[in-house]
Amino acid sequence: AFTNVANGGVYSGATTAMLTITAPPVSFSTNQYRCIVTGAAPCAAQTSRVATLVVNPLPVIVISATAPRSLLPGLTSTFTSTVSPNPAVTYSWIRNGVVLSNPALGVVSGLGTGSIIVDVDGMGDYQLRVTDVNGCTNISNTVTIKDSASGKCFIYPNPTSGKFQVRYYSVANNVLPRTLTIFDAKGDRVLTQFYTIGRPYDRMDVDMRAFGKGLY
């Protein structure tokens, strides 16, 4: 049986020509509605056709990351996701509250899909925003990728054709000047470069293609 609706809760405009239903729960799906219009005498009341409400559930998104979640230079972690109950159409990865777009520092591959690979430049808090086949959007849980403190100096690729990177641990947000000095096999200094470091394992690029082959 039909019952009259009143303003309040999800309903507004109950006695106007337009009934608005705001953020109804999924349990409202398949509810049927009709409108009765009453005119001045001698006009009789008129009842509309029945309209059926469809409420699609929000997607439930769960993300996880493979070990290790505390990264050293050269290591990666892979994020995967599950979306239910309906298939996803679009994927937007979020790091520290900012939606990532190509190219994104620290993301090796996968933006725009349900799985991404991140390296040591991609530290932060990750979420995934999904829109499903019904146009419903939701955001996942949060997974954090951290640095792993080490006293080692990382140099790669090695061997190299002349261009390589050097990484050494620094405390996050501690902006430091750093001097990099390279010596040849005889112990002679052949190159000195200066860098400003602000993140753990900030990348220091070196180009020695102008130097001869050998051990340094």
For every predicted segment, state its role.
Residues A41-T47, V133-I139:
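Short, exposed coil/turn segments at beta-strand boundaries within extracellular/luminal domains
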Residues V37, V130-D132:
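Conserved structural position at the C-terminal beta-strand
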Residues P57-T66, A149-I155:
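Proline-enriched interdomain boundary motifs that mark the N-terminal boundary
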Residues A51-P57, V143-A149:
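Interdomain boundary/hinge segments at the C-termini of tandem beta-sandwich modules
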Residues A1, V83-S92:
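Solvent-exposed loop segments of extracellular immunoglobulin-like
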Residues V10-T30, G106-M123:
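Solvent-exposed segments in extracellular or luminal domains encompassing
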Residues G74-V83, K163-R167:
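A short beta-strand segment in extracellular, disulfide-stabilized domains
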Residues T90-V99, A149-Y156, S161-Y216:
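C-terminal outer-membrane/trafficking sorting elements
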